[in-house]
Design a protein with these regions (language model features):
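Short, acidic, Ser/Thr-enriched surface-loop or helix-capping motifs
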Residues: 56
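Acidic, negatively charged sequence signal
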Residues: 1-45, 52, 65, 69-72, ...
Length: 110
């Protein structure tokens, strides 16, 4: 902990002002990151468009589209395809969130 002497009457105040400024900057950047994370989505699809899944930032399935070709798939294969694409989309959304948060977590948010 720093100690300030009588010869440095404003040193403590200056340090505190700088600290408050830094904290405010981190708060603003955190809010911006939160807003960006809230808009993250990721979509994965089969090549033929039979199945299209979309997830949010947490990897939660938010949309599932089954094209005409999906009717040709056996039920077990369709279920496996939905699960596989959901995992792929969730990995993509997690990577997006990580890229958004990296500047805040690197070097203590400086």
């Amino acid at each position: 902990m720093e100690h300030f002497t009588a010869e440095q009457p404003n040193a403590g105040r200056t340090w505190l002002d700088e600290y408050r400024t830094r904290i405010e900057s981190i708060r603003v950047r955190a809010e911006q990151a939160r807003d960006r994370v809230a808009t993250v989505t990721a979509t994965a699809r089969t090549r033929d468009g039979a199945v299209v899944v979309t997830v949010d930032a947490s990897g939660m399935l938010t949309d599932l589209r089954l094209g005409v070709r999906a009717e040709e798939l056996p039920r077990a294969r369709l279920a496996e395809t939905v699960l596989r694409l959901s995992r792929e989309a969730a990995l993509d959304s997690a990577a997006q969130v990580e890229r958004i948060m990296a500047p805040l977590t690197a070097e203590g948010g400086q």
